[in-house]
Amino acid sequence: MRNKKKFNEFMNKTIEELKDEKRYGTAHVYQSTLNAFCEFCGCKIIYFHQLNRATLKEFETHLRDKQLSWNTVSTYMRTLRGAYNKAVDQKITTGNSRLFNHVYTGVKNDVKRALEVEEINKLLNEVPLKRLPEDLVRCRVWANLMFQLRGMPFVDLAFLHKSDLKGNTLSYRRHKTGGQMIVDIPPTAMELIRQYQNTDCNSPYLFPILSGTKTGEELYIELSLIHISEPTRRS
């Protein structure tokens, strides 16, 4: 007898649980995976019995036909596998240990993502700031600070608090891991900090990247939109 329990309902429940745990990035990946799988299946209701080897292989082919990278395909497949294994553990469906063996779930490192120091210097310094639009000026300032502050991730830069700045040192916790970081600020970076630091006395943030008025999922969405739209936004 086929399992009449709905996989999409289980995925939606998992997404809400992730949001309750404030794991908004993971919840977004689960939602994107569910959307892509529903679009492939041509329906919003998906039963667990539809998760079979043939369907998964066809889904993989469908994603590649849409020009998605192998790493994106792997993300979707690993997300489906994670949800499926969780459902098996909860005895919502019976398990097939080899269900995902024939679809790609690895990570390809065939694309160079790192830049040489000379390339970074060229990007950050070749064109004078005064010749750039205001939105690109801000983007380059943030990139310059991230580079000078020991490769600080953008999310950590955005969440820096005014209280994290102590003289010529930044003392803060990594947003993703919670690990304590202490960074000495080079003179050139300090000059940028003084020039572009937040002037809003009501905001706790060191830089005017986040509004300071949002929390939880709204804050995650705000940061995501800034990360996507900053290079093309016009004042």
Where are these regions (language model features)?
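Flexible interdomain linker/hinge and immediately adjacent N-terminus
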Residues: 57-58, 93-128, 211-218
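Conserved catalytic core of the tyrosine transesterase superfamily
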Residues: 27, 65, 114, 129-144
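Basic/aromatic-enriched alpha-helical hairpins
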Residues: 2-66
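A short, glycine-centered helix-capping/turn motif at helix boundaries
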Residues: 145-156
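Major-groove DNA-contacting interfaces characterized by cationic-aromatic clusters
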Residues: 108-109, 171, 192-225
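Conserved tyrosine-mediated DNA breakage-rejoining catalytic core shared by Y-recombinases
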Residues: 101, 149, 159-195
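Single conserved hydrophobic/aromatic residue that forms the stacking wall/gate
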Residues: 226-235
